[in-house]
Every structure is written in structure tokens, then in C-alpha cells.
């Protein structure tokens, strides 16, 4: 499964849905992980840390939403993200 992590865009939300350690676990279990550029910056996690863990960094949230089978977010999607959702795509967020 291709797991995607877009940067959180809800007001005052600076966390990221997965740490590099979580990326390692997903990859160990046969998944691939894509992370939006600077998604972890609010949690003091650099793109290079994600890359070292095995994730691929993509430039935009649109790329993440278009490719991922599973979207991981901290908060629920907001209205501007609704059109990006695809039929059959799975979303996981803490609400």
C-alpha cells in the first residue's frame, strides 16, 4: 500500500501524522511512504530524516492525494481537501 502524508493545513496545527520511526515500521511491513515536502517542519522533523527512514518526499499535497492509497493526517481534512479525495482512498486522522 502507498501511504501518503500531506502537510497539515488546518489553522494552528503544526504536528505531522507520522514520525520517521513510523515510516520505518510501515516500510518493514511492505508499504511505501510518500511525504509532502516540509510536512514535518512544525514538529522539528526534516525532509532528510524522512528520506533516511525510506520515505520519498514529494513537492505538493496534490501529488500526495493523487497517488496515495492511504492518507495519514493529524486532523480531519478541511473543505479545500475534499476535492482531492478519490473513490476507494482511505483516510486516517485523529478527530
Describe the role of every protein-language-model region.
Residues 4, 25-42:
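Short internal beta-strands
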Residues 6-17:
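Short, glycine-rich nucleotide/cofactor-binding loops
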Residues 16-27:
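Histidine-anchored nucleotide/phosphate-binding helix
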Residues 34-57:
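N-terminal beta-loop-helix "entrance" segment that forms/cooperates
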Residues 54-67:
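Short acidic low-complexity segments
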Residues 69, 89:
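Conserved acidic residues
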Residues 83-88:
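Short, conserved loop/helix-junction motifs that constitute active-site signature segments
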Residues 93-95:
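Conserved small/polar residues in nucleotide/adenosyl-binding loops
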